[in-house]
C-alpha cells in the first residue's frame, strides 16, 4: 500500500492500494483479526433488545451500537476520546472496553474456537477437491487413486484410514476402512499382530489374550451381520466399534488409524511437498517418453498425464507461495462484523435476521455441545456424531448451495444464504455492490420529443431539476438571503415555492446532466446534455439523438444523473456532450442522421419540377427570392437564378453571373456553413471534376431556354443526406486543440481582434491546406464575434469606458470560441432538423387508401402459380416426386411469383412520383418495397414456428419453416380467415425471437466485455513488425465480397513500404491510410493485397499501441492513448447482436449448411469456440497439395475417397468423405492445411491443430464479419481482432526447458515470450508451448486478475486457486479498479498525451500565469 499523507497538521493518512493478494488464513491470522471469542449462540436480549455478552452481537467484541458509548457502563464520551478505554466501573477496568464510533461494527471481527479442526468446505468440494488432488491418495498395494467421494466419506466420518502401517503387511498405508470391509481388515491385522507375540513370555501372554478376545468379538459380529440378510442401516454403520479396534492396533503395533478432519490434518501435516513434486515430475517425464514412442497415442496415458499436470500445479502453488497445506483446516472460525449480518427490528417486537446469523448459531450450539461431551468422557460414537455435525454446520456457513442434496433450510423451507451465496451471482457482492452501485442525485421519467431543442440540450422537468440540484439551489437561496437556513431553504424547495424557479434556472447554467437509456448496450447510451427547464413531468429529448439511445417516444423512460465534481463536469462537457458524439464507434459512420419526418421534409424541399410556377425568374439576392416565395409568387420547386456572389464565395471564372437551382435547394443550402460547396444535385462526389459548372451561367444567357434544357434532378433521399452530414463532419469537426486556441486568445486585444486569421493559420502544420485555411477563417470569425460581445458587456458594466481584460474574461472568451468551434456539425444538423420538420408539415403528405396504387397483373401471376401447384400435386400423386421435393418446389415457385408482382409494382411507383406513400418510401423516411408489396400486391409466404433440431441439420432434412400455402391477398384486398390465421405463426415467432435475442445479446455483450475489459491504448508504437496481410474478404462458396479491401485498410497503418505493381514507392512503413489514399490503392493502382499493422500482431502487453490500432472511428482521427478500446470492441460486437436473426433464418428447405451460416447461434459458436458446432462439420485438408482424384470407396459403399498429391514429398494422402456430403473441392484444385474438403463449419481446435494461430484468426474474422454483413450491419475489423486476440492469448506449455513454467500449465502468451527471451539471452533452453484457443466463457476465468475473474463466473473456484497460490492482483485492468473504487486506468485517468481528447484542462488554467491586475478609479480612468 502507498501511504499518502493529506495536509501538514493532520495525523491521519489515506491509503491507496497498489495491489491485492489472496492467501490461506492461518489460525494466527484469524486471532489477529479477532477482537474476542464468541461463545454463546444468543444474539440480543428479547426484553431489553441489548446485545448479549459473548454472543453474536456482543458490543465488547464487535463495537458499540451507539457512538462513543461504553458497552459496559453506558457512559457517553466525546469524539475526541476515540480509541481510549473506559475505566468508569470495576468491570470496565477489568474488561477495558474501547471507546469507538458505531461504524466500527462494520469492520471489527470476532472468532469461534472450534474444539476440533474442521476441513474448509471449498477445498474438498470446489474444482474436484483440491485436497484430493494434492494428496493423491492410494493404498500402498494398489494403483487406483481414491476419488473425491472417498475423501469426503473420510471427512464425514463414514470411513477410517490407515495413516501409518507400523510395519504390518495386512494394513498397507492409506488403506480406507469402511464398515462393510472393516471386519476382514481388522481380523487380518489383529492376527498378524498376535503372531508377532510369544505365548511363552508371560507379559506377552496377556496381550495375546486381549487380541484373541477382540478376534472372537469380531467373528461373532461378522456372523450376526451375515445371518441378518437385511440388516438395518444402523447396524451396518455402527456394528463395529472402529475406535475399540483402532486402540488395540495402535497400542500393540506402530500402526495408526484415523478418521474425519483429524485424519486429513495428519495427512496434510506429514505430506512432503518437494518429494512429491519430484515423483510427479518423473512420472510425467516417463509418460511423455512413452507417448512419443507410440505411433497411436493412447487416450488413457494422455488422461493420466493431464491429472498429473493438475496435481503438479497444486503442489507448485503451495511450494511457491510458501504456505502449509494444513492451513486448509479451520481451528479458529472468523465471525464477520456484526453490521454485515444485521438483526433488524420489525414492528410488534419481532426480528428479521440475516441467514448467516442462523448458520453461526448452529455452529456455536454444536461446538459447545462437543466441548461438553469431550469433558464428560462421552462414548466415542457420540463425539464422532457431534464432530460430523460441526463439519456439516461449518460447510453450510461457507457454501450452503453446494451442500447438495440437502442444504440447510429456514422455517419457510428456503435454503439459507451462506457466505458464498453472498459473493456469487447477479445479486452477489461482486456484481451487485462492487461493480454496480446505486447513484445519488438521479431521477427518471418518460421521454417526449423536443423538436425545438439544440443538439446539446435536454428538457428537464423543473420539479426534477429542483430535487437534482438541491444543494446548489440551497446555497444560492442562502447567498441571496431568500432563506436564512438550510432547513428553510429545503422547505421552499419541497413546497415548490414560485420564488425558487429563477434561482433554479441560474444554478443549472454550465451544469450538464447525463441521460441514460436502459439497456446500455454501447457507450452512446449515456450522453451529456445542457439542461433546459421545462414545465410538465416528462424529459424532452432531441429527436436526432434517439438513434444512439435506440429510443422512441412510445413510453420509453430515461434516467438523469448529475456530475458533481469539477473534473466530472469537464468530462461531461468535453467527452460526453451529445454534440460531440456524431459518429458511431462501431463503423465510424454518423449515428446522428436525420430520419423519418425530417427526411420526408427535405425530400419535398429539394424536389425539382419542370415548368413550376415562377420558373426561370431572376432575383437580385436570396432575400428577394425568399420574399417572392413567401408571398407565393414562385413555387418551392421552381428553378430560379440568383447572382452567384450573393450565395457563396465561389472561386469561378469571372464571366459567371448566375447560379441556377430550385427555391427549395437555396433554402436547404443555407443550413450548411458559408465555405461549404453549394449542393446542386446528388452527384456531389463528382464536383471535383467541375460537374457543377452547368448550374453556373455567364451574363447574357437566355435563362428560360437554358433552364428548360437542364435535366431534372432527383430530390435528396436519406442516404444522400447522410453522406452530406459525413462530409460536413470530415471538413468541419474540430482540428485544433484548445491549448493552441488559448495561445491566440492570450494575444487578442481590442486592436487586433478583428484580424486573427494569420495567428490561427500559423498554428496549423500544413498552412497551405484548404482545410487549414478554412478552419483558421472559422476560428477568426468566432473570435471576432465573441470578443465584441464580451467587450460590449464589460464596457456597459464600466459606464462606457473600455476595461482591461483579466484572465476571467479571457477564459470566458476561450470557452465560447471552443464551444462554437466544436458545435459546427451539430448546428448544421439542427438547421437541417428545423427545415425537415417545417417542410414535412408544409408538404401535406397523407396516407389514405386511395394512395395505395395496385397492379392489374397480380391476378394473372397468382393464377400461374395455382396452375403450377396443381401440376405438382398430380406429379406427387403419381409418385414422380417426393413430399419434400413438392414442398421445396412450391416454396420456390411462390417466391418467384411474389418477385414478379414486386416488379410490376415498381413500375407503378416510377410513374407516380408525386404520391405521398411513394415519396415516403423513396426518400427513405419510412417503409420499403417489401412493405408496399404486402400492402398492394400479395403478402406471400408466411413463416412457421418450427424448431430446427441438431439432428435435422446433421442429416440435412427438409425443415418446413414456411407455410406451404401462401397468403395470396394483400392488406388492401383484406385477408381471408385462413390467411389471417396462417400469418399469426410468423408474427408471434417474430416477437418471441426478439425477446429471446435481446437477453442473449445482453449476455454476449457482458461476456465480451469481460474478455476485453483490460485492453487500453497504452503506447505510441510497440515496434512490432508482425503485420496482417489483408485482401477482400470473400465468401468462397458464392464468390461474393463480404468486406472490400478499401474498407479494411482505411484508417490503418501500413506494416511495410507499399509499392505499386510497377514498382513505384507509394508510401513508407507506418503511414496512415486515409480514405483518399485507400481509394487510390484500390481503384487507381489496382493493388489486391496490403500488409497493415494489426492488433493481432501487437506486442503491447495488456493493451494495444496506437499504430497497431489505427484510427479512432468515433472521432475519425488517430486513436488517443487511454482509449478503452477493449470495451468499445465488446460493445460494438454486442450491441448489434439483437439485430442478428435466430437460427431459424431461412425460407423453408434443407436445414443444412445454408441456414446455419447465419444468425446469432453461429456467432455464439465462434466466440465460445464450440467443440461441436451445429450441423455437419466440415472436413479440412491436413496437407499442401493438389486433389488428384475423387473415387468411390471399395470398403464402404456410402463413402468417397478424396486423394491429395502432397507437395514436395510426392506422396498420396487420402481423406474418406461420406457420399451425402457436399464437396467443396474438385480434381485439380489446390489445397492447403485448413482448406475445406466438404461444406460446413470448421472446428476451431482442429483448424489450430493442422494450421497456425494466424489461419484461425483469419477464419474467425471472416466468419464473424460474414454474420454481421449478411444482416447489413457493418463493424470494423479491428474490434473483431481485439476479441480474437484475447481468445488466442494463452499458451499450453509442452516442454518447460529451463523456464519457471511446468508442463501442462497454461500461461499468457506475453509471459511466455518474455520468459523465453530471458532464457535465450542467458544461453539456456527455452520453453516450448502451443497456442490454444479459449472461448469467451473461459477467457475471463484465465485472467491475470483474480478480482476480474471471480466477479465474472465460478467465483469459488477462482478464489480457491488464488488463495493456495497466494496470487497477487496488480490492478492493471478496469474491472478490478472499479471493484476497489479506484479511477479506472483509461481515459482521463490514463497517461494521455498533451492536447489529446482526454487532456480536458479547465480554460481558466491557460491564463493562471497572467499577472493579476488591481483596478483603481483615478480621475475617471482605469489604471492597473
Swiss-Prot record:
Known cofactor(s): Mg(2+); Zn(2+)
InterPro entries listed in its UniProt record: DNA-dir_RpoC_beta_prime, DNA-dir_RpoC_beta_prime_bact, RNA_pol_asu, RNA_pol_N, RNA_pol_Rpb1_1, RNA_pol_Rpb1_3, RNA_pol_Rpb1_3_sf, RNA_pol_Rpb1_4
SUPFAM superfamilies per UniProt: beta and beta-prime subunits of DNA dependent RNA-polymerase
Signal peptide positions (record): none
Record keywords, A-Z: DNA-directed RNA polymerase, Magnesium, Metal-binding, Nucleotidyltransferase, Transcription, Transferase, Zinc
Disulfide topology: none
A cellular-component GO term for this protein: DNA-directed RNA polymerase complex
SMART domains linked: RPOLA_N
Domain of life: Bacteria
Protein name: DNA-directed RNA polymerase subunit beta'
Name of the gene encoding the protein in the UniProt record: rpoC
